From Swiss-Prot:
The lineage of its organism: Bacteria, Bacillati, Bacillota, Clostridia, Moorellales. One of its GO terms (molecular function) is tRNA dimethylallyltransferase activity. The keyword Transferase applies. This is tRNA dimethylallyltransferase. ATP binds at residues 15-22.
Amino acid sequence: MSTLSTKEPLAAIVGPTATGKSTIALKVAARLGAEIISVDSAQVYRGMDIGTAKLLPEERVGPDGRPIPHHLIDIVDPDEPFSVADYQKLARQTITAIIRRGHLPLLVGGTGLYYQAVVDPYRFTPEGGDPRVRQELEELAAKFGDAYLHEQLKRVDPEAAKRIHPHDRRRLVRALEVFKTTGQPISAALAWRRQQESPYHLAAVALSMPRPLLYRRIEARVDAMIAAGLIEEVSRLLARYDYRLPALQALGYKEIGAYLRKEIELEEAIAILKRNTRRLAKRQLTWFRRDRRLHWWEVDPDKIEEISAAIADFISRTIDINVE
């Protein structure tokens, strides 16, 4: 592969859950000689397979049966700390390695923060943070609840408070930690990032789908996960790990975990999981709609071949790829 740009080429297929990103990405990767880099904050964890819709190794193949390399899947255990800064570092190293092999790196997934940490010049400061400040904030959250941290963040960084969910403890702690250790709001770093140019020659696609169809697919996906053994998967994880770990608060694992602890009935857990997945899809759409560099494709499940070919052609023309 060669490109006319002096920047490293990078392609991406992002969008809400259940829009068919994995299926389309395999076809696009096969056409372009690409290697896929997962952009999913839950697929990094080993043992979390069904609930994250992780493709099995034998499913990571193109239409001709040839393997499509996948990266940043199954890289840490659920009890290992892993941050967006860790992801950024590994993803950028992987991008460079793929290009050196003469292939195109293709980001695929729906975790908006991970995606933007790679394609934009995100700065993570202070490096490593301050464990004492972090511990203090964790203790405040345990004593007064996540909503208390969110109120504190509103006072010092209202822009960040708008972006961070009131119950996303990890990100609330991080935002307050940055303010307490630097005196600067974390939103200032985001504003700086928005003013800078991407370090990559980017061809980025986002997938969408009519909402009624998307919601039907979400319902069917959750039912399929239950049938495939999600309850057993969560049970195995809870036998080894503390359910309060950030990894096990991921979508699917939190709801089924509550059922296994007998806090709710299975029927209620499934209904909550479907509702939370719909809410996730809405948040993902909102996040990606803010990025004007994304070129949107509405997915018709009956026209996957045509859509995949069109996306591959768009990427090829945008980056001026010559596949060798």
